[in-house]
Amino acid sequence: MVSRGTRIGWSLLCAFLCLGVACAHNGPEHQIEALSERLIREGASADVLLERAIEYRVLGKLKEAARDLQRAVRLAPSDSLVLLELAQIELQRRRGPEALLWVRQALQIPGLDTGERAAILMIRSHCRAAEGSKLEALEDCSEALKWNPQLISAYLERSAWQQRLQRPRERILGLEEGIRRTGAGLLVAERIEALLDDAQWQQALDAIEPELTSSRLQGTWKIRRARALKGLSRRTEADRDLQSALEEIELRMPREVKDSSLLMDRAFARELLGQTEAAIQDYKLAARCGGGEEAIEAGRRLRRTRSGRPLWPWRT
């Protein structure tokens, strides 16, 4: 018997393959038409309704996607993939309480494997976040990791919540645990960010040096090293790193469609150099290019500091 986790993996793969074929040929509209004809010909099934819901989501038709998924749930009330997709759609529709109801139903499914349960708990964390329950969102990330210690995204999201809740030591220890369990480079970088946020300048610098040596693209790592160097009052070296990072970013920046991650790096480098207005403009542009809430909040924070108050603990 094929486990539900395996079926979910294959279902997701098939959904993405269908999406790729649809986009490459006649687009989601054609795929929706074909799936609708199939539903008429063969009768309703949860799998086909799920496929059509995914196509509707691609088109931004979230109401139609939710309607299909609700039908799918009635046909297959113990299908965790359908319930998770519906919960995510409801979150996109800003219907957090409804999303949480579907998550609760998913958690009650008998025989969930560890990967499924962890995925459901992460969706519940997003529901908690949507309702402003930061501590509960953090706890869900930690619980998800008990079920699936290899879930890198859960370590990263937990780290973000620990930062917001001002739990620096807990954040660092959690990331170190994740690195031991997964060896993920993303967690190595996040740990260094956590050390910097906690003003552990020398520890951060010691961790940055080997990463910088082995990295082909060094701009982001030089910005991190500059931050540590400034914390150690080594301003001349820090400014040299920042100028070098800016030069690399300019070479990598596309001329037409701007890259939000590069814009965020450039903004932060300019901020550390004291180029406040230029940094604010970069944060604004990053927000328009997909930088999300992080870019918006960084711009707001920097605008609040125009009065001349220190931006960072090491700035005088």
Feature annotation, model-predicted:
Residues 47, 81, 115, 119, ...:
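Start-of-helix register in tetratricopeptide repeats
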Residues 43-44, 77, 111, 115, ...:
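Short coil turns that delineate tetratricopeptide repeat
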Residues 54, 88, 126, 160, ...:
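Residue-level recognition of tetratricopeptide repeat
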Residues 38, 71-72, 105-106, 110, ...:
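Canonical positions in the second alpha-helix
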Residues 272, 280-316:
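Terminal, low-structured helical/coil segments at or just beyond the last alpha-helical repeat
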Residues 58, 92-93, 123-126, 130, ...:
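Register position in tetratricopeptide repeats
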